[in-house]
A protein has these predicted regions:
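Bacterial N-terminal signal peptides
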Residues: 1-5
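Acidic, Gly/Ser/Thr-rich repeat motifs that build Ca2+-stabilized beta-propeller blades
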Residues: 11-195
Length: 208
């Protein structure tokens, strides 16, 4: 469920010297499964991800289009057979390019089997399981195309470990943002391994 939240100060309290805000929420969407991130356009269009389902968009008129799903999902215009979810891993961050109105570019962080190679047999190997995808969004907001995997080797945790909440996919990162300079910033999780933030050759446990 996604909410719109409005803060407003109570007039009587404000008049008495207290400025205590109250909160009003309205359900914008219901029935979602593990919604993870949102990216807004100036007109109110909202791209959003569901961790184990995929990428969708809520248009400024309120209609919803399912754009790009994960393996075995239904109802999406297209799907990536290499994309999967497990624990805290799945389709996570989404952000629109700063010049989206000109280039129609969208970035999405997801977990993928495409670049695993032979490195995912234990939690102590370099398991390249998280990627950043770049898409072009159609002008009618009904489909995405030209998937390009621009980051392919952010490490993923394939097996359970003895840490609290230590299942597969734990500490998976996934946040995407565009900075003031127009650069794309990517957060990779530490996958429950202290070596990740300390080893400069690994992308896990880093802000890229």
């Amino acid at each position: 469920m996604l909410f719109g939240i409005v803060f407003h100060a109570n007039a009587a309290e404000h008049a008495g010297g207290m400025n205590v805000p109250s909160i009003k929420s309205d359900a914008v969407m219901t029935g979602l499964e593990n919604p993870w991130d949102m990216a807004f356009l100036p007109d109110g269009t909202m791209f959003f991800t569901e961790k184990c389902k995929g990428l969708s968009v809520r248009t400024s008129s309120g209609s919803v289009n399912k754009l790009y799903g994960m393996k075995d999902t239904k109802g999406y215009n297209a799907a990536g057979k290499d994309l999967f979810c497990d624990g805290q891993a799945g389709m996570l961050g989404v952000v629109a390019d700063r010049d989206f109105d000109k280039n129609r570019t969208l970035y999405v962080y997801s977990t993928s089997t495409k670049y695993h190679g032979s490195g995912c047999k234990t939690n102590f190997e370099k398991c390249d399981g998280n990627i950043v995808m770049r898409f072009k969004v159609s002008s009618d907001l009904k489909k995405v195309s030209d998937r390009t995997d621009i980051v392919k080797d952010i490490q993923y945790k394939p097996f359970e470990s003895n840490q609290p909440f230590g299942g597969p996919g734990a500490h998976n990162g996934g946040r995407l943002r565009i900075g003031p300079g127009g650069y794309l910033w990517v957060a990779g999780g530490d996958r429950h391994r202290g070596v990740c933030p300390q080893d400069g050759k690994l992308l896990c446990g880093k802000v890229l």
